[in-house]
Amino acid sequence: MTFHPQPQAGSPKPWAFPAPERGALGNGLTLLTSHRPGQQVVAVEVLLAAPLDAEPEGLDGVATIMARALSEGTDQHTAEEFAAELERCGATLDAHADHPGVRVSLEVPASRLDRALALLAEALRAPAFPEDEVKRLVANRLDEIPHELANPGRRAAMELSKELFPAELRCSRPRQGTEETVRRIDAAAVRAFYTAHVRPATSTAVVVGDFTGLDLPALLDDTLGRWTGASAAPRPRPAITGNDEARVVIVDRPG
């Protein structure tokens, strides 16, 4: 039997991560843009300086609820209308809260970038945080917690953070809050956290895709550039200390 010759690997080619173009909008929003010809789906990432250690005492999880509520209605659209507008653009919008801050992610075909950027700016500029939507998100989060505690991997990760870091550090506690802290979250708490920490002057937007035929500076100025907010000094990062002494921890998980 004759086999096809084994393919040979080609010579490795040098590669370097493309350096983005840096800039800023008039409202203080830092911009990083990267033109990638052929990448017809544009990705936009906005990092908000709203870290988990900024959450008020006893309200662990409020950053997560705020992130989830950003697209649940604005001053111009209800939650259902906003979702429908995103769908018409063929866009997806997600938000996630983590220790460094809240990350808002948009993906959209380049041909519909203008409308999708307007919706993103709307969600950042004027989220409504309706009482009923916040209550629903809190209820959803409370439903998630028992499943996380029942998952051995998630339970082990929580215990690891608790063992490694001092109790006063936010990173020692569950990122999305506990049942006790999440129950305290309401629309007023979400609005207060948003007002205190979400503003363009301390945020960064990263835009990557094929910008051929697009006036990207004008698009960004007409959308994200209309987002306003007070200036603020960068939030100091807490010193992180940890106990990395070797030990074995047994976690009881009844059931």
Predicted features along the sequence, with ranges:
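An aromatic/glycine/proline-enriched structural segment found at the starts
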Residues: 1-16, 167, 171-175, 180, ...
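Scaffold signal of the M16-like zinc-metallopeptidase fold and its non-catalytic homologs
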Residues: 1-3, 72, 116, 148-200, ...
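N- or domain-start disorder-to-order transition segments that initiate the globular core
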Residues: 2-41
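Extracytoplasmic
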Residues: 17-20, 26, 39-43, 62, ...
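Buried hydrophobic packing residues in well-ordered domains
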Residues: 28, 46, 64-66, 86, ...
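M16/MPP (pitrilysin/insulinase) zinc-metallopeptidase core fold and M16-derived inactive scaffolds
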Residues: 43-110, 173-174
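M16/insulysin-pitrilysin zinc metalloprotease superfamily fold
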Residues: 72-76, 106-140
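Acidic/histidine-enriched alpha-helical segments
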Residues: 84-87, 127-146, 212, 232-245
